[in-house]
Amino acid sequence: IVSKTVGVYKRYGLKGFCTKLNEKISSPMRTYGKRVAEFLPTEEELGAQREHRFLVEPCISIVVPAYETNEQFLKELLASLEGQSYDNWELCIADGSRTDQVERVIKERIRQYEDAGCRYKIRYERLKENNGISENTNEGLKLVTGSYVGFMDHDDVLERNALFEVVNV
């Protein structure tokens, strides 16, 4: 970091160095997290969203093509869906993995849902072969039964009010 700093100073001089430093410090990306937090709902607002009933409550199908997904990432994706303030969703996973890592996590979660009597649904298909993200996504689309479709990567997470906001529009 020191050598990079010295390089910038040599290349741009003191005035240019100060300008570059100011640009870095005031970059929108540095304040992104703070700005996003201003718009996230409070726990009280999330509770109100969970209690809210829409005239029409469509099922939202979330399509996820999976391939050798890190178990922790997959569990975080599941937790982000389970924590939604709108709960009429289904997860449609098309798994092109060579190993059974994704399948084990998903089948265990399905069993937990069944034992708890949860409304959540997971539709899972183990593909015969991995055909890449596009074809695996197309296979995931075949599992969809919801009125709306969303797409996520296998390592994505959603804010807790994301699906509520989709239906609220």
Describe every region a protein language model picked out.
Residues 1-5, 9:
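Intrinsically disordered, low-structural-confidence terminal and linker regions
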Residues 18-169:
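Nucleotide-sugar donor-binding/catalytic module of glycosyltransferases
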